Amino acid sequence: MFKSLAAVLPRASKAKFLQKNYASTLAFIESSKDGSVSRSSLSLLAAAQKLSNPITAVITGSKAEKTAEALKSSYSCSNLEKLVIFEDSKLDTCLPEQLTPLLVKLLKGGDYSHFVVSNSSVGKSVLPRVGALLDVQPVCEVTVIKDPKTFIRPIYAGNIISTIECQAEKKLLIIRASAFPPIAEGSMDSVTIEKRTDIPPCDLNVTWVKTILTKSERPELTSAQNVVTGGRALKDKETFEKLLSPLADVLHAAIGATRASVDNGLCDNSLQIGQTGKVVAPNLYIAIGVSGAVQHLAGMKDSKVIVAINNDPDAPIFNVADYGLQGDLYKIVPELTEKLGKYK
């Protein structure tokens, strides 16, 4: 086919160069209401670093430039090379119908081998749409990145750990933020910021009506360092609040709940932890009156220290707990709250 080895080498060298150039990652960064970088996005960048590719981060919304500057001046991500910002207030709501055309345009216009989002409500809404338009099957809830094409994720409520080798030209990943520590603090003077305004129109007739925010001084559930969770055993809404709130106040903790608690009207469904709720991995997780259904364990078993309080010695929650207190939670929890308050 080739007349000489000299003819082969230049072509091989060029092919290698093109392949290396193509290995790059696009990461979607979310910001908080004040323009700071969301904690899940900091973990997302930590995961993206494990792909060992140059990283381009895209930031949208009216505070995109503020978020970009905060990321550049306050954190360190070794592979991050460029921040692409689309500063427009119409993107503040993060409607997937508006974000999807923009992200698809970026992916088609750049040589990206990977596109990563966090497992936030925005990420979970956007990536399936992007995948459909690119005809690529996303890999969801990635907890381990072994190499640029091999990923590990839990399935069947965490009972099976699946290893996936993705052969797609563009790999779309939803990263479980709780599985990766956030990037370290520092600064990135060499990172460039590119401002763009070429936002493609949304073909769908979708309008954001209003935002209803639940005001709370407690930490956000998915990023809290300590979580206190109540189960079905708490019986009613008043008991749920009366027992859990003082303990959560002492520990500066977020409050969570099982699906049974939510279904029984003990609390709002925004507190639900588990397979059909939120996934948390705090430093301390206290389960009060939680039996330990498989679906609930899927959302909290990666917690660093798990404390279970239950009067049933055979409750499944004790199988994953680091510390267990068997007894009447109506006596144990107030006493624990009082002693922790004195220690504080």
From Swiss-Prot:
GO terms for molecular function: electron transfer activity; flavin adenine dinucleotide binding. GO terms for biological process: fatty acid beta-oxidation using acyl-CoA dehydrogenase. InterPro entries: DHS-like_NAD/FAD-binding_dom, ETF_a/b_N, ETF_a/FixB, ETF_alpha_N, ETF_asu_C, ETF_asu_C_CS, Rossmann-like_a/b/a_fold. Its cofactor is FAD. It is found in: Mitochondrion matrix. It comes from the Eukaryota. The keyword Cell wall biogenesis/degradation does not apply. Binds 1 FAD per dimer. GO terms for cellular component: mitochondrial matrix; mitochondrion. Its main location: mitochondrion. SMART domains: ETF. Keywords: Electron transport, FAD, Flavoprotein, Mitochondrion, Transit peptide, Transport. FAD binds at residues 284-312. Present with 2950 molecules/cell in log phase SD medium. Heterodimer of an alpha and a beta subunit. PANTHER family: ELECTRON TRANSFER FLAVOPROTEIN ALPHA, ELECTRON TRANSFER FLAVOPROTEIN SUBUNIT ALPHA, MITOCHONDRIAL. Belongs to the ETF alpha-subunit/FixB family. The electron transfer flavoprotein serves as a specific electron acceptor for several dehydrogenases, including five acyl-CoA dehydrogenases, glutaryl-CoA and sarcosine dehydrogenase. It transfers the electrons to the main mitochondrial respiratory chain via ETF-ubiquinone oxidoreductase (ETF dehydrogenase). This is Probable electron transfer flavoprotein subunit alpha, mitochondrial. It comes from Saccharomyces cerevisiae (strain ATCC 204508 / S288c) (Baker's yeast). The gene is AIM45.
